[in-house]
C-alpha cells in the first residue's frame, strides 16, 4: 500500500509538472450514465447505478482512458450500447458496497475472463475494510476476491478452463488488481494514468462510502455516489455532503444520486425515515453545486424514478416528471446546466 501511494504521489506531481495535455491535440471528456435506477428495485428496464468516464482526443473518440464508476445490474448491456467492451476498461471504482451499485460487476469480470482469460488485470479501486457503527465489516477486497465463487462452485469456471487452458484456472478474481485506500476527509489521489488523475474523499452513506473526482486536460467530474451529510438527522444545514462539496470546488460536472422531497417523512410516502435522510435531496444538491461553482449537474439514481413509484412506497401527489426534478434543482438555486439522468445520458467537454 505504501509503495502504491508513493508511486501515485509521484505521478500526480509529474502530471501537473509536465502539462499532460501536451500529448493531446484536441483533448475531450465524455461522461455517460450507464445506469440510473435508484436503489435495488427494478423499474422500466433502468440499469443499476453506474457512470462511464472516457478521456482522450478527437482522434480516438475520447477513448484513450475508460473508467467505470460503480457497476449496477445491466452495466455490461449499457456499455455494449456504447460499443465499449469490458476488456476496454482501464479501471472500475466503487463508491460503496450496496448491491444496486455492485451486482453487475460479476458479469463484467466473468466476460473479461471468458474472452481475455490471460489478462491484463483490471484495476478495481475502492475503500479498505470499514466497520459500521453496528459492528458490521464492509469489505470491497473480499467482494472482489470472491466475485466468481458461484461460478466456481457450479463448476462453470473449471469447465470453461478445461476447454481453453489459456484462461486462468482460478477464474475472474485472478484477473483483478484490487487497490484499496483509507477514505479521509481530505482528497487523496488513488489512481492515475495517461493525463487522468482520480482523487477520493470520505463521504457518509454506509461505512466505507467514498466519492471521486476525475481531473483531465479536457475537464473534470465528481462522482458523488449516494453521499449524504455526516449528520444523519436534522437539525443540519443541508442533506448534502460537506466532503463532496470540498471535493467539487471548481469542478465542471457533478454526477450525484438524489431523492425528491416528496419522499420526505410526513408527506405520505411511507418511506423509512433513515432511508430518506441518508440521501441528498435535489434542492440541497443543487445548492451545494452552486456554492462549489459547478457548471453541469447530472442527476442520477433518482428516487423516485421518473414516471414510477419507488416500490413499496407511495406517491400521494402523483408520479414525477423530468420537469419536477428540474424545478427542484432550480429551487435549490442552481442556474447551470441540469441533466435529469436517463440511462446513456451523456455530456461531452468540450461540447461538439
Predicted regions and their residues:
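Positively charged n-region of N-terminal signal peptides that target proteins for export
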Residues: 1-4
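Bacterial N-terminal signal peptides
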Residues: 6-19
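Intrinsic disorder/low-complexity signature
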Residues: 19-21, 298
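Binuclear metal-dependent hydrolase catalytic cores
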Residues: 24-221, 233, 312, 316, ...
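Cap/insert and terminal regions of metallo-dependent hydrolase folds
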Residues: 207, 218-220, 228-342
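Conserved CoA-thioester-binding segment of acyl-CoA-metabolizing enzymes
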Residues: 224
Amino acid at each position: 500500500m505504501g509503495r502504491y501511494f508513493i508511486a501515485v504521489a509521484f505521478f500526480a506531481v509529474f502530471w501537473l509538472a509536465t502539462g499532460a495535455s501536451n500529448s493531446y491535440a484536441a483533448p475531450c471528456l465524455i461522461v455517460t450514465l450507464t445506469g440510473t435506477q435508484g436503489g435495488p428495485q427494478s423499474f422500466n428496464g433502468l440499469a443499476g447505478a453506474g457512470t462511464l468516464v472516457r478521456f482522450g482526443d478527437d482522434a480516438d473518440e475520447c477513448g484513450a482512458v475508460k473508467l467505470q464508476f460503480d457497476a449496477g445490474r445491466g452495466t455490461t448491456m449499457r456499455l455494449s450500447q456504447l460499443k465499449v467492451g469490458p476488456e476496454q476498461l482501464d479501471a472500475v471504482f466503487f463508491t460503496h458496497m450496496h448491491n444496486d451499485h455492485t451486482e453487475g460487476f460479476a458479469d463484467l469480470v466473468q466476460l473479461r475472463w471468458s474472452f481475455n482469460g490471460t489478462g491484463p488485470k483490471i484495476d478495481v479501486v475502492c475503500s479498505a475494510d470499514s466497520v459500521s457503527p453496528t459492528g458490521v465489516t464492509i469489505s470491497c477486497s473480499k467482494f472482489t476476491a470472491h466475485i466468481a465463487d458461484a461460478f466456481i462452485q457450479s463448476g462453470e469456471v473449471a469447465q470453461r478452463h478445461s476447454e481453453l487452458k489459456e484462461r486462468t484456472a482460478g477464474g475472474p478474481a485472478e484477473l483483478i488488481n484490487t487497490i484499496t485506500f483509507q477514505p479521509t476527509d481530505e482528497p487523496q489521489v488513488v489512481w492515475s494514468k495517461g493525463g487522468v488523475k482520480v482523487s477520493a474523499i470520505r463521504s457518509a452513506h454506509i461505512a466505507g462510502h467514498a466519492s471521486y473526482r476525475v481531473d483531465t486536460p479536457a475537464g473534470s467530474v465528481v462522482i458523488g455516489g449516494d453521499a449524504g451529510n455526516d449528520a444523519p438527522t436534522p437539525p443540519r444545514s443541508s442533506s448534502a455532503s460537506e466532503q463532496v462539496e470540498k471535493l467539487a470546488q471548481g469542478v465542471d460536472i457533478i454526477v450525484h444520486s438524489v431523492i425528491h422531497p416528496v419522499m420526505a417523512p410526513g408527506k405520505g410516502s411511507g418511506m423509512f425515515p433513515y432511508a430518506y435522510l441518508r440521501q441528498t435531496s435535489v434542492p440541497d444538491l443543487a445548492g451545494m453545486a452552486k456554492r462549489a461553482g459547478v457548471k453541469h449537474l447530472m442527476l442520477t439514481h433518482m428516487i423516485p424514478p421518473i414516471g414510477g413509484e419507488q416500490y413499496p412506497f407511495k406517491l400521494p401527489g402523483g408520479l414525477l416528471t423530468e420537469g419536477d426534478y428540474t424545478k427542484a434543482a432550480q429551487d435549490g438555486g442552481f442556474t447551470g446546466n441540469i441533466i435529469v439522468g436517463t440511462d446513456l445520458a451523456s455530456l461531452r467537454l468540450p461540447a461538439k
